Amino acid sequence: MVSNLRLYYQIKDLIEIIKPKLLIIPFEGHAWERLIIKMVKDLNKDIKVASYQFTVTTNHQHSIFRPLKASYNPDIILTSGKITKKKFQENYKCPVKILGSNKYKKISRSKVKKQNKFLIIPEAFYSETDRLLNFTLDVAKILPDHKFIFRCHPMMKSDEFINKISLQDNVKLSNKSINDDLNICKYVVFRGSAAVFEAVSQGLKPIYLDVKNETNINPFKNIFLNSCNVIEPEDIFKILRYYESKKINKDIIDYSNNYFAEIDTKVIRSLL
């Protein structure tokens, strides 16, 4: 609450000094975002407020897709791609435009033959990183002929996990670019990370780590097949058997390719 109010007054001071025509703020469903919108509209109704959705959304997010009174709603919503544009259009009356995302990657297929390598992509939370790492180490023990590349989120300090990773010879901590990792891996193990869209677009086969009695945070939501979920380390064997005879679900590929679009700067110019 204190941080919300501090941000409120900091942005208020900047707006009074700069007097912008357009204010672009993040749109993740936080209370402070609505406070900023209300403040701007009270200060000067001629200032346009554009709210930009740039992160993954899940089935359990309500605040971001729930319109409030007009004074708390943005004048325009900018999205990362087609998927979220459609969802916002179903809920809001204001214009919704695709701005795109720096996470957008052109669809390509690596010429490097991908064999027996898993890419693990946790979110920027210690609990999620630790959970995925423990799962990875357990799976690595029962699949000694496979290699596992653990890629910490850029906001996490990977040093905290080096000692654990060093205990298992076939698990390595990534120090390469995400493109390098995507080019050499065949599978991607994930929970709520947006990087899974890039991975699937580059041909990696997705494996979701489900946790008993906890909310499902799979970014693919209802289109993801339960047959590609793992709960226990031993479940990895059924996944490998499944992918021996099955290709990635086409709905998953289409969803990945449409979640992030290329950045379109003309959208911003059109608002000025």
Q: Model-derived features: where do they sit?
A:
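Active-site and donor-binding regions of nucleotide-sugar-utilizing enzymes
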Residues: 1-102, 196
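Structural motif
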Residues: 21-24, 76, 117, 147, ...
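Short, charged/polar "capping" segments at the starts of alpha-helices
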Residues: 32-33, 58-61, 84-88, 106-107, ...
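Catalytic binding pocket for nucleotide-activated donors in carbohydrate/polymer assembly enzymes
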Residues: 92-98, 162-167, 194-259
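Conserved catalytic-core segment of nucleotide-activated headgroup transferases in glycan assembly
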Residues: 94-164
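Active-site donor-binding acidic/aromatic loop of nucleotide-activated sugar
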Residues: 100, 169-176
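Acidic donor-binding loop of glycosyltransferase active sites
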Residues: 183-191
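C-terminal alpha-helical cap of glycosyltransferases
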Residues: 258-272
